[in-house]
């Protein structure tokens, strides 16, 4: 079957000549000639029939559109950025320049990477220049003048210096050769993530939460209620406190820690304060030497010898588990292990405090160094103590013990569970000091200066099997007029 095209009036066609030679389909150099065979005209009029057979009527070469084998598809690697031609034609571009598609089409001289349009949120915002050259020059002149060197710095100027320093850090981060510019990433998601990281680095770090001693020992702090309500009172002074002015080396009292970590969310939201165990042990040693010293006391020779013997016994008990504690402490990875251990401690402390509110047993919670971190209201009222005085400074459980025998027995029991023995419960008896403060009445009518207790200790261990926390529940032994003891 052949197709006959109508003759255009005024034109004649010589035998054997094509339509393009008569000017109907003009030719131009560089454009491939369209064949005028009947099959070609049929392909032009019905292109869908040719496509159904897997052939394109205007295909340049069979090698350019040949089907790839599964091995070839698996072996080829897509490039991160295509060239202009492959990007416009939605073709698979290669890594080499010029790419294979451009070489096959004789477009090797025009093969270049496509230039992508930058999103609006990726555009860099320039920091507005501060018009203050005259003020900076006057500031340098003031620094050169010797008579004005003693003036304190202006807080507002110091704030501006901090702002300019952070902006300079951000600019150096963008212009640094070690950092990769945002335009080198070929994904908008990577570019956005890179910009967010730059903002995090340029912004100031989270405020420190180390509270100085002058605030930790302030007697005007409120009382921390452990048994009445879940919410602890907050003073306006603590809310307006500037955490950024704190020093990490300073001690943070348990009272301030109670303000910072009031729930589980606060432990993960705020910066974790590492606890300095060596300093706590040094304070414990100083207390023991002061407690068992007999200088300035009217003691007999036998009493002095007894105190000296008790102190040496305590030091020998401490020396038995001290090397294990030191070696484990040195093996920790700073600062992450210390932060993890302190987070675990604060998390367990919240759980045990919530548990102490559910029962009426007088409870004291202390660290492995003996430093008290929590105390129930029942025991505070029973001993006539002030909770703010106990928790606002470094107070050891040994300071509440009445006699030296109770202190020696404490170290003997703690040494039995410090290393090796993993028994987590201890039952013992001890005597605690009953010293009513001014304006505070105790619940006991005893005339003695102490109260004898039967206590149960629960030892909570950390990840390294060291005693992390000791929860002591104390049941008072009250004498009756008949000579029988009641619990």
Curated annotation (Swiss-Prot):
Primary localization class, coarse: nucleus
Keywords in alphabetical order: DNA-binding, Metal-binding, Nucleus, Transcription, Transcription regulation, Zinc
Domain PAS: 348-420
Record feature DNA-binding region, as residue ranges: 83-111
Cellular component, GO, one term: nucleus
Biased composition (Polar residues): 59-68, 122-139
Compartments (UniProt record): Nucleus
Gene Ontology molecular function, alphabetical: DNA-binding transcription factor activity, RNA polymerase II-specific; RNA polymerase II transcription regulatory region sequence-specific DNA binding; zinc ion binding
InterPro entries per record: ERT1_acuK_gluconeogen_tf, PAS_13, Zn2-C6_fun-type_DNA-bd_sf, Zn2Cys6_DnaBD
Annotated spans, Disordered: 1-75, 122-158
Domain of life, per lineage: Eukaryota
One biological process term in Gene Ontology: cellular response to starvation
Gene3D superfamilies: Zn(2)-C6 fungal-type DNA-binding domain (4.10.240.10)
Biological function: Transcription factor which regulates nonfermentable carbon utilization.
Stated family: Belongs to the ERT1/acuK family.
Name of the protein described by the UniProt record: Glucose starvation modulator protein 1
């Amino acid at each position: 079957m052949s197709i006959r095209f109508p003759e255009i009036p005024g034109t004649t066609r010589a035998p054997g000549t094509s339509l393009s030679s008569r000017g109907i389909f003009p030719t131009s150099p560089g454009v491939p000639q369209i064949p005028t065979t009947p099959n070609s005209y049929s392909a032009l009029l019905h292109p869908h029939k040719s496509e159904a057979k897997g052939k394109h009527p205007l295909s340049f070469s069979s090698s350019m559109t040949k089907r790839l084998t599964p091995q070839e598809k698996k072996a080829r690697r897509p490039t991160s950025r295509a060239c202009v031609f492959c990007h416009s034609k939605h073709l698979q571009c290669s890594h080499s320049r010029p790419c294979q598609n451009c070489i096959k089409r004789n477009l090797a001289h025009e093969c270049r990477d496509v230039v992508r349009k930058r999103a609006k949120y990726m555009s860099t915002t320039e920091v507005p220049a501060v018009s203050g050259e005259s003020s900076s020059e006057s500031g340098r002149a003031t620094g050169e003048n010797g008579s004005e060197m003693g003036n304190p710095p202006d807080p507002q100027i110091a704030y501006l210096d901090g702002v300019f320093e952070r902006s300079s850090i951000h600019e150096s981060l963008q212009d640094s050769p070690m950092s990769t510019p945002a335009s080198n990433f070929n994904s908008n998601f990577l570019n956005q993530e890179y910009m967010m990281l730059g903002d995090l680095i340029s912004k100031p770090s989270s405020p420190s939460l180390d509270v100085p001693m002058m605030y930790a020992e302030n007697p005007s702090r409120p009382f921390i209620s452990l048994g009445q309500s879940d919410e602890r009172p907050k003073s306006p002074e603590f809310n307006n406190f500037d955490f950024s002015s704190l020093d990490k080396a300073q001690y943070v009292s348990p009272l301030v820690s109670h303000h910072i970590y009031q729930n589980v969310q606060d432990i993960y939201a705020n910066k974790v304060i590492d606890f300095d165990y060596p300093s706590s042990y040094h304070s414990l040693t100083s207390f023991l030497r002061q407690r068992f010293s007999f200088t300035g006391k009217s003691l007999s020779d036998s009493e002095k010898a007894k105190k000296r013997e008790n102190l040496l016994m305590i030091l020998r008990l401490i020396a038995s588990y001290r090397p294990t504690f030191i070696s484990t402490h040195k093996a920790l990875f700073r600062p992450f292990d210390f932060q993890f251990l302190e987070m675990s401690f604060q998390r367990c402390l919240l759980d045990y405090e919530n548990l102490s509110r559910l029962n009426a047993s007088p409870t004291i919670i202390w660290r492995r160094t003996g430093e008290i971190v929590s105390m129930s209201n029942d025991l505070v009222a029973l001993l006539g103590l002030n909770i703010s005085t106990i928790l606002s400074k470094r107070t050891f459980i040994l300071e509440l013990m009445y006699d030296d025998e109770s202190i020696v027995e404490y170290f003997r029991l703690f040494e039995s569970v410090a290393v090796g023995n993993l028994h987590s419960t201890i039952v013992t008896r001890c005597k605690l000091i009953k010293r009513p403060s001014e304006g505070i009445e105790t619940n006991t009518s005893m005339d003695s200066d102490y109260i004898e207790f039967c206590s149960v200790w629960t030892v909570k261990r950390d990840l390294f099997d060291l005693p992390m926390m000791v929860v002591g529940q104390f049941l008072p032994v009250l004498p009756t007029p008949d000579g029988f003891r009641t619990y």
